[in-house]
Every structure is written in structure tokens, then in C-alpha cells.
Amino acid sequence: MFSGNRYLTKRIHKELPLFLQLLLWNCIAELPVPKDYLQIFRLSGAGSQQIILHSQEVPPYEKRYQFAVPFSPVTAKIYVIAEYDANQKPYATMLFAEEY
């Protein structure tokens, strides 16, 4: 489902550091359970620590990541949504929750 082209909104491209973009895609790729079409990432910070809570609904999954970052931690809710185009080719889009 997440094996096709990957897209991001202009806002994700502009506001989310590339390191975090790549990390979120990797979190999806490494999921140890079947992937839901909707992946949810809640980002927050504590000092110089970035905290990411990754979840999906079906099957239920949740994992927390925490690590030091050389930039101000990002606070946001991000969706990655998997879909199929008119030719039934899979693709996924990363966007801020409020862009949905």
C-alpha cells in the first residue's frame, strides 16, 4: 500500500525538516504489523528532544520515539495517507492534519 510514489504538500516540504520527513517514511516502511491506509504522527518536543508518537487504527498500533535534534523540536500532527490512482497504482501523501 505504501510501495508507490511518495508525495508531500508544499507546507510539509517547507516546514518539516527533511530529516523528519525521511524518518516518518521509514517508520511506515518498518512497521511490524499490516499497514493501515492512514498513518498518524503526533510530534512534540521536550527541551532539545523530538518526540514522535506513531499510530494507526487497523490493526491497532502505537510506538513512541524520542531523540535529540539539532533544531527546535517540531510540534504538529501529520497524516500519511495511502491511496490508488486511476490506474490502480499505489501512492502516498504526507500532509499536516489541518491540510486534510
Where are each of the predicted segments found?
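N-terminal "domain-start" segment
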Residues: 1-70
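Short, compact, well-ordered microdomains
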Residues: 60-100
